[in-house]
Amino acid sequence: MNYRYRAMTQDGQKLQGIIDANDERQARLRLREEGLFLLDIRPQKSSGVKTRRPRISHSELTLFTRQLATLSAAALPLEESLAVIGQQSSNKRLGDVLNQVRSAILEGHPLSDALQHFPTLFDSLYRTLVKAGEKSGLLAPVLEKLADYNENRQKIRSKLIQSLIYPCMLTTVAIGVVIILLTAVVPKITEQFVHMKQQLPLSTRILLGLSDTLQRTGPTLLATVFIVAVGFWLWLKRGNNRHRFHAMLLRVALIGPLICAINSARYLRTLSILQSSGVPLLDGMNLSTESLNNLEIRQRLANAAENVRQGNSIHLSLEQTAIFPPMMLYMVASGEKSGQLGTLMVRAADNQETLQQNRIALTLSIFEPALIITMALIVLFIVVSVLQPLLQLNSMIN
């Protein structure tokens, strides 16, 4: 959630800006850590002008980051770099955004402050890394790391989507074929069986019952599914229900461990990027939670950051969240002892992502043939149920 704040620096200079945080308490805490004296803070109201998200894809944002890193490494002034990238961009909205950022820089604002006007495009992680690069004088290397980080996330997401396309299409086709057979084909073939004086086989009676039920209650079922889906969506938007739902997902077999594995790898990778860019550990732990989608996991990791603030070790604090597997915790503990925390966190994230990709591939390799076999058995049942009374009728005629 975005919060608009007014604060005063230790030098007495007043400033205002926007900060992303889970809640107001975390926003106040992070501003205090930056050495700011908070004057006012409130949730940012949704406004059609200021908070409208520009339609810019993740790949375009990554390309912009990579180009800016290259031009910065070539010692080209920042405002000139933004002008060049904006002119070459095929996305008019991105060009408009870069022009506004460039105007803010020409007015004397640093890049990190200029990006605050577009919080939905440049999130707090992006802005914090840019700010760290500006302070350290290593903006180009930090932007390279940020581009690599975004590319890695895109690759993982693309692989997951690509691996799910075929099973989803196969499932949709299978369900569609069964519905067409039961509602259109089977009734026409089996309507002649109704007048048979002899009792129909059990499988045929079951098939006729399913077909009749689906034809009578089909529209009602569709309406019920739609109403339930809309009701569930409205329920998620009320109060703390989304948090409760996310906590419930973590207790579901297979789904819970998968969510924990994906989020734990993303968290450690984000934290390693922040730490290697000069962001303080506690700030990095709080910022890393914002890259996660599950609210329950975000809350647990926020509690872990608070434990570290109180003097506990990182690996013990992370262990209490019940999110990280033993191997990841072991590598974090080794990194704490050896002083190579960032390096070992990256390795732990790499190992976890590779393991999860292998598990997903194995699961899908089992699911696809299982679905085909199930579909074949359903079609076989329909064929047998139709043929049995036909053969029975043929024997009666003979």
UniProtKB/Swiss-Prot annotation:
The gene is gspF. The chain crosses the membrane at residues 165-185, 217-237, 366-386. Part of a cryptic operon that encodes proteins involved in type II secretion machinery in other organisms, but is not expressed in strain K12. GO terms for molecular function: metal ion binding. It comes from Escherichia coli (strain K12). One of its GO terms (biological process) is protein secretion by the type II secretion system. It is a multi-pass membrane protein. Ca(2+) binds at S90, E144, D148. Its main location: membrane. This is Putative type II secretion system protein F. Belongs to the GSP F family. Signal peptide: none annotated. It is found in: Cell inner membrane. Keywords: Calcium, Cell inner membrane, Cell membrane, Membrane, Metal-binding, Protein transport, Transmembrane, Transmembrane helix, Transport. Residues 1-164, 238-365 are cytoplasmic.
